[in-house]
Amino acid sequence: AKEKVEKHFPGAETACVPVADGGEGSVDAFITALGGSKVTVKVKNPYFEDMDSYYGLINEGKTAVIEMASCAGLPLVEDRKDPRKTTTYGVGQLILAAAESGVEKIIVGLGGSSTNDGGCGAAAAVGVKFYDKDGKEFVPTGGTTADICKIDLSGKAEILNKVEIVTMCDIDNPMYGPTGASHIFGPQKGADEAMVLELDEGIKNLSRAITEAIGKDISEVPGTGAAGAMGAGMIAFFGSRLQMGIQTVLDTVKFDEMISDADYIITGEGKLDSQSLRGKVVIRSEERRVGKECR
């Protein structure tokens, strides 16, 4: 975009800002804006295979930034799309590694996921236990969340209680139902109509189990359906709060100051659709530009 603008408007002054909403590129956006470094961690990929992933360190090593997509992203599964089998286990490994490094705050970006496990894999990686009706422990995936009978949070790594965890979430969908995780995002992850219904029933059962485990129903909290219901998992299993990812990034890079005298703001969206009206980068940028919400 920069080259095109300078070609057609030779006298224009341009400034490029790395902007992401919690999905791919978010770690680089923070590091580019604030300085920092990447830390490589060996974790599990969406199919429980070993891979090298990473998290970013900013604010003099006090804050870690994690992209869910870096180890549970859709590009990692290539032609093996199947949200019944993929896991967020690696995300939990990244969160635990960052916490053990001594950071005070962890920012987790949701988006671009290949999963629909409600964050169960990530939870299992940090010590949360899931049991089926026979009392057998297992690590749920999208296709087996329907088998969850009980959740035990007592074994969760204690160090996580000493770290502030913030989740960047760019959509406001609930856990399940017509506008939930499975129905809205399942098809892009490889789910056909029958599979969507199966996944949705699984997330509904997970919601029941979460309610029993933490004593409250979070299924309608905006954003709990994000990234295959990972939003719900971040609240229930990690004690995190959800906030608009784009708001977090733009505030961090002091975007308002940068555009105070701008005539135009050019941003992008992989596909302009109904989700663009629910907090995507292209709309949130304009909201901030004009000082009011655009719908």
Model-derived features with residue positions:
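Anion-binding (especially nucleotide phosphate/pyrophosphate-binding) glycine-rich loop
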Residues: D50-T115
